Amino acid sequence: MAYRDQPLGELALSIPRASALFRKYDMDYCCGGKQTLARAAARKELDVDVIEAELAKLAEQPIEKDWRSAPLAEIIDHIIVRYHDRHREQLPELILQATKVERVHADKPSVPKGLTKYLTMLHEELSSHMMKEEQILFPMIKQGMGSQAMGPISVMESEHDEAGELLEVIKHTTNNVTPPPEACTTWKAMYNGINELIDDLMEHISLENNVLFPRALAGE
């Protein structure tokens, strides 16, 4: 099967660093992971032949860890340590930086107005979301009750969509997370942190939406 006919989410999991390539082209492989590469490229008016060629090069590299075949309990433990704990560190620091940048550079036209508010909203939503996963959904899956978790999983997927929408607002507010020439050190550091957060959150959502949840619902 050609890459263009495969879902973005599957490609992001099977090809090393494909997720970084999709991020470069602003293609949503987490919440929009079920759309094929061809459809995603068409929506962005991108040349699918060029992207396929880049994926073919990436596919030659060895994959570090194939989570599609890992035990569900191992995936859950990885998600908590690698993503949940990391987001809990990232967002408070980014909110502090955004507060400072918006205050100090309030008179500059390029200041990302509203960024503190949007990061705070994301922090509050994710804090509640991750707590529900850790206290309710993940224990159900670990106990082999994933096939009975359609309700909680549908809620989590809906909340993933909401987080994805907030990321789009944040990208719009920050000129696609690109610092202006006059940006100070804090401003640049904050944008580096936001880019890292976006990468982490998209990988996090993709692993749940495209691997953990479907396998849990299938009764593993």
Swiss-Prot record:
Query: Which GO biological-process labels does this protein carry?
Result: protein repair; response to nitrosative stress; response to oxidative stress
Q: Which Gene3D superfamilies match?
A: nmb1532 protein domain like
Key words of the record: Cytoplasm, Iron, Metal-binding, Stress response
Tell me which domain of life the UniProt entry assigns to the organism this sequence originates from.
Bacteria
The entry's localization annotation reads: Cytoplasm
CC terms in the record's Gene Ontology section: cytoplasm
Spell out the InterPro entries in the cross-references.
FeS-repair_YftE, Hemerythrin-like, RIC_family
MF terms from GO for this chain are: metal ion binding
Q: What does this protein do?
A: Di-iron-containing protein involved in the repair of iron-sulfur clusters damaged by oxidative and nitrosative stress conditions.
Q: Which family does it belong to?
A: Belongs to the RIC family. YtfE subfamily.
Q: State the oligomer form and interacting partners.
A: Homodimer.
Protein known as:
Iron-sulfur cluster repair protein YtfE
